[in-house]
């Protein structure tokens, strides 16, 4: 699962793959009732992927569990899962993304096609979607919606007016999950690294049109070609918007962005929280980043009275500010014109949205726009349909067992000093875990959504989100502000604050079934949740205290002991060689593999706690212990091309799924459950099993 800490990769598009055998579940017909609530007209069928694995034929009972547990658990599924040529890999997580994508599409389109209460969530969601589907209205308006802002850009005549305009673009589009902003700086409101009581504005570098700073400065043929294509794209957009000399303007824009990129911090700095923690007072901007008229900038940004900031990449702020000082107003104005059109391309005529590659599928583009603009409105409707209160309660009960189990594990550790144990237990007690969806939703009642005004809807929504985030600067820190939306399959660990979140869309079969087998739930979703919990207490989690503040709480001896024990696991991982010429690099995947094992151990303890001394139930010829480990192995199944597997081994911090399932070989209970003995290929002598948590 994802735990971006303070930086994260951008999410990819949902794949749509009908050919895999488990995509057979029926979808409910959705309607909007008289109260404006989306409901299922037909009963939703049981999930296509059963958590009672023996019924599906996914296993291969001809394989001995102790020799190859992954193929014992998944051999049947692997045999019938053919990877289409257009895909490089496919797994259960991808299936959940597909499923959620279809569910979100259906509920948004249902909201758009049925009468609903004015001002209700269904009306806002449906009308936002409808406005993007109203191509006639969008084409008729042309570029008129941009006229006022284009006039403002044209009127920029000095550093002060340029700085003031740049301040208006400081929006809240970056956060713990989204590291990129298409504006010169990005804003995230969150607690400070050393202050858990006050929300602060975190400023991030932004404003580049290409994905990475290296795309601008790397001399490789691929980046040279990419820059040429980007310059041609800039020219095409400007020409469509009616600007003469578009090729010359495009060259100037690329030159400006290249100068900005040279000041950007490299991506490698994102992994070093101490490089991100740069508290600046308001006066520091004038002293450390001269050039920008910061008084005008922050006044326009709504931050005139804000005394404290966190600057994540000081070199970028200093470099961009210096570029404002240079006499290049026309270059800046062309840059702002291009990015204005680019930013709103999806709400502009088709010629522009097509050039911006946002019009391949109008309906899907409208769904994506709606989901992005009104995430918690869509999320609330999604939760009503697909994650009922009973499922949330059952998942929360499981989390309670996981916390009890982890508490006992910490108390019994031999390598952690007594003082560090005390701090670990305090951190565990303070850990906030959000399940499914927020207890308090964003209130959209003041936001007007108009059915025939796509551009206006975007602008009003951006203003709404900006004001909502600025208001948080005057509010106490809320550790359970959700960084992920219910309809997005995923899990997020936020070290600061000390909180973790698991969306409704990830807590679906086959990971979790609110009506399904407890042993399977604990072995799959339980192990995943415990995996994330363990990261709060590992070598990286050790630098954040119970309140999410920076501060190491391990002793030097604790660190040495942890590294000695985890080093043994790295050696075990080094032995995994899917190809004769390529083996896993144990150190590269160590952190995630330690968490996999910790999650499995804690989840097993929690499953035992859930039984409350009662006898296990037999299902499909398997007892609870067997189903627990089977579910763990089945969550890692994946079909993958050789090239994709080689790329994963070369650069990913996670083991290939086949080897992630082999964490069972370090768990004593697995040996008992499947009668694994010396001579079996996965057998590890008890004294050599990895024992960290």
Where would I find each of the regions flagged by the language model?
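Gram-negative bacterial Sec-dependent N-terminal signal peptides
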Residues: 12, 16-35
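Short, Gly/Pro- and small/polar-rich lid/capping loops
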Residues: 42-57
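Intrinsically disordered, low-complexity linker/terminal regions across diverse proteins
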Residues: 47, 259, 288-291, 314, ...
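Hydrophobic/aromatic-rich, well-ordered segments within soluble, folded domains that form packed cores
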Residues: 59-79, 216-239, 590, 600-602
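Noncatalytic, helix-rich "gating/capping" subdomain that lines the substrate-entry/channel surface
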Residues: 111-401
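Short, solvent-exposed loop/turn elements at domain surfaces
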Residues: 77-81, 210-211, 510
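N-terminal secretory signal peptides that target proteins for export/translocation
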Residues: 1-17
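Active-site-surrounding "flap" and adjacent substrate/cofactor-binding loops of secreted or lumenal enzymes
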Residues: 47-48, 61-137
